């Protein structure tokens, strides 16, 4: 089957791994050696980021294809505590049917996710109205991309799972939620693809990938 060899796809994060450290890409994507997950009593940046993505998808899920106004956002902000709690339960694999007394750490997690989500929504309020086109679409962006390997043409399947695609003032925007402190500037274009360069801008690489 000619399509079967393209079942494995290169995502934006895999692409940035390859550019920043080809050895890390080999161990993770070729050799299949996954990075250790956060310990149960430790909440790492990746876990926080995943929970924020879950909350934002829940917040806008019913708005796909519709115009989102600032009033609509403000009215739904009261749902953030419940959405943040649900995201934590899902990510930490807690029992959703058990009304447990939340630990101090769990309360802090919920509050942190709320604050991250509010920061996104405050920005959304300022630019509203806009129309949500897609959220976390896992099927729409999987094109074949031609590359040259040892003098011959090969193809790889790319995969882009974009957090949000919306339309604002007749322009299509790609929105990628971040919980870290990503740089908005870069030096030279070639330096973005040099794994020995200092301070590689992974957020910009992902944007170019999309």
Each predicted region: which residue ranges?
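A non-catalytic, helix-rich entry segment at domain boundaries
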Residues: 54-145
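C-terminal, charged and often intrinsically disordered regions of DNA end-processing helicases
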Residues: 1-58, 155
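Active-site-proximal structural scaffolding
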Residues: 7-11, 19-20, 41, 45-49, ...
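Short loop/turn segments at secondary-structure transitions that flank enzyme active sites
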Residues: 24, 33, 58, 62, ...
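Non-catalytic protein-protein interaction segments used by genome-maintenance enzymes to assemble
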Residues: 134-208
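C-terminal substrate/ligand-recognition segments
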Residues: 51, 59-62, 174, 206-210
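Glycine- and acidic
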Residues: 3-14, 31-42, 63-74, 92-107, ...
């Amino acid at each position: 089957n000619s399509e079967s060899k393209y079942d494995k796809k290169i995502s934006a994060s895999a692409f940035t791994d390859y550019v920043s450290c080809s050895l890390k890409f080999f161990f993770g994507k070729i050799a299949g050696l996954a990075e250790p997950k956060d310990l149960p009593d430790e909440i790492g940046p990746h876990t926080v980021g995943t929970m924020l993505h879950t909350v934002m998808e829940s917040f806008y899920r019913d708005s796909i294809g519709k115009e989102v106004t600032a009033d609509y956002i403000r009215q739904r902000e009261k749902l953030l505590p419940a959405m943040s709690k649900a995201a934590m339960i899902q990510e930490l694999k807690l029992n959703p049917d058990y009304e447990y007394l939340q630990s101090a750490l769990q309360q802090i997690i919920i509050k942190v996710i709320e604050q991250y989500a509010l920061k996104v929504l405050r920005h959304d309020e300022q630019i509203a109205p806009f129309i949500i086109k897609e959220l976390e679409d896992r099927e729409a962006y999987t094109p074949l991309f031609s590359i040259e390997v040892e003098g011959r043409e090969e193809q790889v399947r790319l995969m882009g799972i974009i957090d949000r695609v919306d339309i604002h003032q007749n322009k299509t925007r790609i929105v990628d939620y971040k919980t870290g402190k990503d740089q908005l500037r870069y030096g030279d274009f070639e330096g973005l693809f040099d794994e020995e360069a200092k301070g590689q801008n992974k957020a910009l690489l992902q944007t170019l990938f999309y």
